Regions:
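Flexible, solvent-exposed loop segments that connect beta-strands
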Residues: 62-65
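Extracellular/periplasmic, surface-exposed regions of secreted and cell-surface proteins
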Residues: 1-57, 68-362
Length: 363
Protein backbone atom coordinates (compact mmCIF):
# COMPACT_ATOMS: atom_id res chain seq x y z
CA UNK A 1 0.00 0.00 0.00
CA UNK A 2 1.26 3.46 -0.85
CA UNK A 3 0.33 5.18 2.42
CA UNK A 4 -0.06 4.48 6.12
CA UNK A 5 -3.72 5.50 6.20
CA UNK A 6 -5.73 3.54 8.76
CA UNK A 7 -8.22 2.36 6.17
CA UNK A 8 -5.47 0.98 3.94
CA UNK A 9 -3.60 -0.72 6.78
CA UNK A 10 -6.82 -2.31 8.02
CA UNK A 11 -7.27 -4.10 4.72
CA UNK A 12 -4.33 -6.44 5.49
CA UNK A 13 -5.18 -7.11 9.14
CA UNK A 14 -7.28 -10.22 8.33
CA UNK A 15 -4.04 -11.85 7.13
CA UNK A 16 -3.74 -14.79 9.58
CA UNK A 17 -0.32 -16.36 10.26
CA UNK A 18 -0.05 -19.10 12.89
CA UNK A 19 2.76 -21.36 13.99
CA UNK A 20 2.44 -24.31 16.35
CA UNK A 21 5.40 -26.22 17.77
CA UNK A 22 5.22 -29.51 19.68
CA UNK A 23 8.04 -31.47 21.32
CA UNK A 24 7.99 -34.78 23.15
CA UNK A 25 11.03 -36.59 24.53
CA UNK A 26 11.25 -39.74 26.60
CA UNK A 27 13.78 -42.40 27.41
CA UNK A 28 14.97 -44.89 29.95
CA UNK A 29 18.15 -46.50 31.22
CA UNK A 30 18.56 -50.03 32.58
CA UNK A 31 21.71 -51.07 34.44
CA UNK A 32 22.71 -54.63 35.31
CA UNK A 33 25.80 -55.45 37.39
CA UNK A 34 26.12 -59.18 38.11
CA UNK A 35 29.57 -58.50 39.62
CA UNK A 36 31.12 -55.46 41.26
CA UNK A 37 33.59 -55.18 38.38
CA UNK A 38 31.16 -56.09 35.59
CA UNK A 39 28.44 -53.65 34.50
CA UNK A 40 25.97 -53.38 31.64
CA UNK A 41 23.92 -50.32 30.68
CA UNK A 42 21.20 -50.03 28.06
CA UNK A 43 19.68 -46.65 27.18
CA UNK A 44 16.72 -46.10 24.86
CA UNK A 45 15.53 -42.65 23.83
CA UNK A 46 12.80 -41.17 21.65
CA UNK A 47 12.49 -37.57 20.50
CA UNK A 48 9.51 -36.30 18.49
CA UNK A 49 9.18 -32.73 17.27
CA UNK A 50 6.57 -31.16 15.04
CA UNK A 51 6.07 -27.71 13.59
CA UNK A 52 2.99 -26.52 11.74
CA UNK A 53 2.95 -23.18 9.91
CA UNK A 54 -0.40 -21.88 8.62
CA UNK A 55 -0.75 -18.84 6.37
CA UNK A 56 -4.35 -17.80 5.64
CA UNK A 57 -5.79 -15.05 3.49
CA UNK A 58 -9.50 -15.51 4.22
CA UNK A 59 -12.41 -15.22 1.83
CA UNK A 60 -12.92 -11.51 1.11
CA UNK A 61 -9.25 -10.60 1.54
CA UNK A 62 -8.49 -7.36 -0.28
CA UNK A 63 -5.69 -8.62 -2.54
CA UNK A 64 -7.21 -12.09 -3.09
CA UNK A 65 -10.99 -11.83 -2.68
CA UNK A 66 -11.63 -15.58 -2.91
CA UNK A 67 -8.94 -16.39 -0.33
CA UNK A 68 -5.88 -18.64 -0.15
CA UNK A 69 -4.33 -20.99 2.41
CA UNK A 70 -0.85 -22.43 2.76
CA UNK A 71 -0.22 -25.13 5.37
CA UNK A 72 3.21 -26.63 6.10
CA UNK A 73 3.72 -29.57 8.47
CA UNK A 74 7.25 -30.68 9.45
CA UNK A 75 7.93 -33.72 11.66
CA UNK A 76 11.12 -35.27 12.99
CA UNK A 77 11.41 -38.59 14.82
CA UNK A 78 14.69 -39.61 16.45
CA UNK A 79 15.06 -43.07 17.98
CA UNK A 80 18.28 -44.11 19.76
CA UNK A 81 19.58 -47.34 21.27
CA UNK A 82 22.82 -47.32 23.25
CA UNK A 83 24.44 -50.27 25.03
CA UNK A 84 27.73 -50.20 26.97
CA UNK A 85 29.35 -53.01 28.93
CA UNK A 86 32.55 -52.83 30.97
CA UNK A 87 34.77 -55.20 32.90
CA UNK A 88 37.57 -54.13 35.26
CA UNK A 89 40.35 -56.50 36.26
CA UNK A 90 43.47 -56.07 38.41
CA UNK A 91 46.29 -57.78 36.53
CA UNK A 92 48.82 -56.88 39.23
CA UNK A 93 48.67 -54.79 42.36
CA UNK A 94 49.63 -51.68 40.41
CA UNK A 95 48.26 -52.65 36.99
CA UNK A 96 44.56 -52.46 36.17
CA UNK A 97 42.71 -52.90 32.93
CA UNK A 98 39.22 -51.73 32.03
CA UNK A 99 37.72 -53.36 28.96
CA UNK A 100 34.51 -51.93 27.53
CA UNK A 101 32.35 -52.73 24.54
CA UNK A 102 29.04 -51.62 23.17
CA UNK A 103 26.94 -50.52 20.27
CA UNK A 104 24.71 -47.69 19.18
CA UNK A 105 21.91 -47.30 16.65
CA UNK A 106 20.27 -44.01 15.69
CA UNK A 107 17.25 -43.69 13.43
CA UNK A 108 16.41 -40.24 12.11
CA UNK A 109 13.21 -39.72 10.10
CA UNK A 110 11.98 -36.42 8.64
CA UNK A 111 8.61 -35.82 6.99
CA UNK A 112 7.40 -32.62 5.42
CA UNK A 113 3.95 -32.00 3.94
CA UNK A 114 2.93 -28.76 2.28
CA UNK A 115 -0.51 -27.94 0.95
CA UNK A 116 -1.66 -24.88 -0.98
CA UNK A 117 -5.27 -24.04 -1.78
CA UNK A 118 -6.92 -20.98 -3.29
CA UNK A 119 -10.39 -19.76 -4.30
CA UNK A 120 -12.80 -20.82 -1.55
CA UNK A 121 -16.55 -21.11 -2.27
CA UNK A 122 -17.49 -18.86 0.65
CA UNK A 123 -16.66 -17.55 4.10
CA UNK A 124 -16.83 -20.95 5.86
CA UNK A 125 -13.92 -22.29 7.92
CA UNK A 126 -11.20 -22.75 5.25
CA UNK A 127 -9.13 -25.88 4.66
CA UNK A 128 -6.83 -26.78 1.79
CA UNK A 129 -9.27 -29.44 0.60
CA UNK A 130 -12.16 -26.94 0.45
CA UNK A 131 -10.34 -24.77 -2.12
CA UNK A 132 -11.09 -25.13 -5.82
CA UNK A 133 -7.37 -25.08 -6.77
CA UNK A 134 -5.11 -27.35 -4.73
CA UNK A 135 -1.37 -28.12 -4.83
CA UNK A 136 0.42 -30.56 -2.52
CA UNK A 137 4.06 -31.51 -1.95
CA UNK A 138 5.55 -34.24 0.24
CA UNK A 139 9.11 -35.14 1.26
CA UNK A 140 10.27 -38.09 3.37
CA UNK A 141 13.74 -39.01 4.56
CA UNK A 142 14.92 -41.82 6.83
CA UNK A 143 18.55 -42.50 7.82
CA UNK A 144 19.88 -45.24 10.11
CA UNK A 145 23.37 -45.14 11.55
CA UNK A 146 24.64 -48.06 13.63
CA UNK A 147 27.98 -49.16 14.98
CA UNK A 148 29.82 -51.06 17.67
CA UNK A 149 33.09 -50.46 19.53
CA UNK A 150 35.72 -52.07 21.72
CA UNK A 151 38.01 -50.16 24.08
CA UNK A 152 40.65 -51.02 26.65
CA UNK A 153 42.21 -48.68 29.23
CA UNK A 154 45.42 -49.89 30.85
CA UNK A 155 46.21 -48.12 34.15
CA UNK A 156 49.71 -48.51 35.61
CA UNK A 157 50.23 -47.09 39.11
CA UNK A 158 47.61 -44.39 38.45
CA UNK A 159 50.34 -42.56 36.52
CA UNK A 160 50.50 -44.13 33.07
CA UNK A 161 47.36 -44.64 31.02
CA UNK A 162 47.21 -46.38 27.65
CA UNK A 163 43.88 -46.41 25.80
CA UNK A 164 43.26 -48.39 22.62
CA UNK A 165 40.00 -48.89 20.80
CA UNK A 166 38.18 -49.34 17.54
CA UNK A 167 34.72 -48.42 16.26
CA UNK A 168 32.93 -49.94 13.27
CA UNK A 169 30.10 -47.95 11.68
CA UNK A 170 27.48 -48.63 9.06
CA UNK A 171 25.09 -46.09 7.59
CA UNK A 172 22.08 -46.45 5.33
CA UNK A 173 23.42 -43.48 3.34
CA UNK A 174 26.54 -45.42 2.31
CA UNK A 175 26.60 -46.88 -1.18
CA UNK A 176 25.58 -50.52 -1.60
CA UNK A 177 29.12 -51.44 -2.60
CA UNK A 178 30.88 -49.71 0.28
CA UNK A 179 30.23 -51.82 3.39
CA UNK A 180 31.40 -50.79 6.86
CA UNK A 181 33.88 -48.15 8.02
CA UNK A 182 36.50 -48.85 10.73
CA UNK A 183 37.80 -46.05 13.00
CA UNK A 184 40.79 -46.95 15.25
CA UNK A 185 42.09 -44.83 18.13
CA UNK A 186 44.90 -44.84 20.70
CA UNK A 187 46.01 -42.43 23.42
CA UNK A 188 48.75 -42.23 26.03
CA UNK A 189 48.92 -40.01 29.11
CA UNK A 190 51.54 -39.61 31.83
CA UNK A 191 50.91 -37.88 35.17
CA UNK A 192 54.37 -36.40 35.37
CA UNK A 193 53.77 -34.68 38.69
CA UNK A 194 53.24 -38.05 40.43
CA UNK A 195 56.84 -39.06 39.81
CA UNK A 196 59.28 -39.01 42.73
CA UNK A 197 61.57 -36.48 41.03
CA UNK A 198 58.78 -33.89 40.69
CA UNK A 199 58.98 -31.09 43.31
CA UNK A 200 56.05 -31.19 45.76
CA UNK A 201 55.43 -27.45 45.47
CA UNK A 202 55.52 -27.29 41.69
CA UNK A 203 51.87 -28.06 40.96
CA UNK A 204 50.37 -30.79 38.79
CA UNK A 205 51.40 -31.75 35.26
CA UNK A 206 50.03 -34.32 32.81
CA UNK A 207 51.46 -35.06 29.37
CA UNK A 208 49.19 -36.59 26.73
CA UNK A 209 49.15 -37.69 23.12
CA UNK A 210 46.48 -39.32 20.98
CA UNK A 211 45.71 -40.60 17.51
CA UNK A 212 42.28 -41.40 16.15
CA UNK A 213 39.96 -41.39 13.19
CA UNK A 214 36.44 -40.05 12.74
CA UNK A 215 34.08 -39.78 9.79
CA UNK A 216 31.32 -37.72 8.21
CA UNK A 217 28.60 -39.59 6.35
CA UNK A 218 27.06 -38.43 3.07
CA UNK A 219 23.46 -37.30 2.78
CA UNK A 220 20.49 -39.65 2.73
CA UNK A 221 20.17 -39.87 -1.09
CA UNK A 222 23.68 -38.94 -2.27
CA UNK A 223 24.65 -42.55 -3.08
CA UNK A 224 21.53 -43.54 -5.03
CA UNK A 225 20.38 -42.61 -8.51
CA UNK A 226 17.38 -40.32 -8.30
CA UNK A 227 14.89 -38.88 -10.75
CA UNK A 228 12.89 -35.71 -10.28
CA UNK A 229 9.15 -36.19 -10.92
CA UNK A 230 7.80 -33.30 -12.95
CA UNK A 231 4.62 -32.69 -14.87
CA UNK A 232 3.63 -30.27 -17.59
CA UNK A 233 0.14 -29.83 -18.87
CA UNK A 234 -1.11 -32.68 -16.71
CA UNK A 235 1.36 -35.18 -18.26
CA UNK A 236 3.58 -36.99 -15.70
CA UNK A 237 7.30 -37.37 -16.40
CA UNK A 238 10.73 -37.88 -14.82
CA UNK A 239 13.94 -35.93 -15.44
CA UNK A 240 17.46 -37.03 -14.33
CA UNK A 241 18.60 -35.57 -11.01
CA UNK A 242 21.34 -37.45 -9.06
CA UNK A 243 23.52 -39.90 -10.99
CA UNK A 244 24.35 -41.92 -7.85
CA UNK A 245 27.51 -43.65 -6.64
CA UNK A 246 27.28 -47.21 -5.23
CA UNK A 247 30.78 -46.92 -3.71
CA UNK A 248 30.14 -43.65 -1.86
CA UNK A 249 31.31 -43.70 1.74
CA UNK A 250 32.17 -41.27 4.53
CA UNK A 251 35.05 -38.86 4.48
CA UNK A 252 37.62 -39.93 7.07
CA UNK A 253 39.65 -37.57 9.25
CA UNK A 254 42.82 -38.85 10.92
CA UNK A 255 44.16 -36.69 13.74
CA UNK A 256 47.30 -36.75 15.87
CA UNK A 257 47.63 -34.46 18.87
CA UNK A 258 50.07 -33.91 21.70
CA UNK A 259 49.96 -31.55 24.66
CA UNK A 260 49.85 -31.05 28.39
CA UNK A 261 47.51 -30.01 31.22
CA UNK A 262 49.07 -28.04 34.07
CA UNK A 263 47.85 -26.67 37.38
CA UNK A 264 49.74 -24.54 39.91
CA UNK A 265 49.20 -22.51 43.09
CA UNK A 266 46.49 -24.79 44.50
CA UNK A 267 44.61 -24.89 41.17
CA UNK A 268 44.49 -21.10 40.91
CA UNK A 269 46.56 -21.22 37.72
CA UNK A 270 45.53 -23.67 34.99
CA UNK A 271 47.07 -24.01 31.56
CA UNK A 272 46.30 -26.26 28.59
CA UNK A 273 48.36 -26.68 25.43
CA UNK A 274 47.59 -28.85 22.39
CA UNK A 275 49.23 -29.26 19.01
CA UNK A 276 47.07 -31.04 16.41
CA UNK A 277 47.57 -32.33 12.90
CA UNK A 278 44.56 -33.50 10.88
CA UNK A 279 44.33 -35.07 7.47
CA UNK A 280 40.99 -35.71 5.80
CA UNK A 281 41.00 -38.34 3.07
CA UNK A 282 38.16 -39.37 0.78
CA UNK A 283 36.72 -35.91 1.36
CA UNK A 284 33.17 -35.51 0.09
CA UNK A 285 33.13 -33.04 -2.80
CA UNK A 286 30.68 -32.22 -5.57
CA UNK A 287 32.02 -33.34 -8.96
CA UNK A 288 30.55 -32.10 -12.25
CA UNK A 289 29.24 -34.90 -14.47
CA UNK A 290 29.67 -35.19 -18.21
CA UNK A 291 26.59 -33.68 -19.92
CA UNK A 292 26.47 -36.68 -22.28
CA UNK A 293 25.26 -38.85 -19.38
CA UNK A 294 22.03 -36.87 -19.23
CA UNK A 295 22.67 -35.88 -15.61
CA UNK A 296 23.34 -32.16 -15.31
CA UNK A 297 23.62 -32.02 -11.50
CA UNK A 298 26.90 -32.51 -9.65
CA UNK A 299 27.57 -35.83 -7.89
CA UNK A 300 29.05 -36.23 -4.42
CA UNK A 301 32.30 -38.21 -4.63
CA UNK A 302 35.09 -39.33 -2.27
CA UNK A 303 37.86 -37.53 -4.13
CA UNK A 304 39.39 -34.81 -1.99
CA UNK A 305 42.15 -34.56 0.58
CA UNK A 306 42.50 -31.72 3.09
CA UNK A 307 45.07 -31.08 5.83
CA UNK A 308 44.80 -28.96 8.98
CA UNK A 309 47.30 -28.26 11.73
CA UNK A 310 47.65 -25.76 14.53
CA UNK A 311 47.85 -25.16 18.24
CA UNK A 312 45.36 -24.46 21.03
CA UNK A 313 46.38 -22.65 24.21
CA UNK A 314 44.21 -21.94 27.23
CA UNK A 315 45.05 -20.06 30.44
CA UNK A 316 42.72 -19.58 33.42
CA UNK A 317 43.58 -17.57 36.54
CA UNK A 318 41.64 -17.37 39.80
CA UNK A 319 42.66 -13.83 40.76
CA UNK A 320 40.42 -13.40 43.79
CA UNK A 321 38.77 -16.13 45.88
CA UNK A 322 36.65 -15.34 48.94
CA UNK A 323 33.43 -16.45 50.61
CA UNK A 324 31.53 -13.48 49.18
CA UNK A 325 32.89 -13.06 45.67
CA UNK A 326 35.53 -14.18 43.22
CA UNK A 327 37.29 -12.92 40.13
CA UNK A 328 38.50 -15.26 37.38
CA UNK A 329 40.36 -14.43 34.20
CA UNK A 330 40.67 -16.68 31.17
CA UNK A 331 42.18 -16.40 27.72
CA UNK A 332 42.30 -18.81 24.77
CA UNK A 333 44.42 -18.69 21.64
CA UNK A 334 44.32 -21.02 18.65
CA UNK A 335 45.68 -21.30 15.11
CA UNK A 336 44.58 -23.40 12.14
CA UNK A 337 46.59 -23.80 8.95
CA UNK A 338 44.59 -25.58 6.28
CA UNK A 339 45.42 -26.70 2.76
CA UNK A 340 43.52 -28.41 -0.03
CA UNK A 341 46.00 -31.19 -0.83
CA UNK A 342 44.05 -32.81 -3.65
CA UNK A 343 40.75 -32.48 -5.51
CA UNK A 344 41.02 -35.92 -7.10
CA UNK A 345 41.35 -34.47 -10.56
CA UNK A 346 38.32 -32.19 -10.22
CA UNK A 347 38.53 -28.57 -11.33
CA UNK A 348 38.54 -25.77 -8.72
CA UNK A 349 35.07 -24.80 -7.59
CA UNK A 350 33.19 -22.41 -5.29
CA UNK A 351 32.05 -23.72 -1.90
CA UNK A 352 32.01 -22.78 1.80
CA UNK A 353 31.68 -19.09 0.86
CA UNK A 354 34.99 -19.22 -0.99
CA UNK A 355 37.08 -20.86 -3.70
CA UNK A 356 38.35 -24.45 -3.38
CA UNK A 357 41.68 -24.99 -5.18
CA UNK A 358 44.61 -27.35 -4.70
CA UNK A 359 47.48 -25.86 -2.71
CA UNK A 360 45.27 -23.15 -1.21
CA UNK A 361 43.68 -22.83 2.26
CA UNK A 362 40.14 -24.02 2.90
CA UNK A 363 37.77 -21.02 3.20
Amino acid sequence: FGSAAFNDVGQVLPFDIQKRIERFTTGGTMTYSPLTNFTNRLTVGYDFSQQEARNLRPFGFNQRPEGALQNNLWQNRLLTFDYVGSFTYDILETVRTNFSWGGQAVGDEIRELEGWGEDFPGAAQPTVSSASVKIAEEERQRVWNAGFFFQNVLDISDKYFLTTGVRVDGNSAFGDGFGLQVYPKASLSWVLSDESFWPDNFGQMKLRSAYGQSGRAPGAFDAVRTWDPVGWGGVPAFVPENVGNPNLGPEVTSEFEIGFDGSWANDRINAVFTYFNQRTSDALMEVTQSPSTGFTETQLENVGEVSNNGIEIGLNLALIESFDYGLDFGINYSTNNSEVVSLGGAAPFAALNGWIEEGQPVP
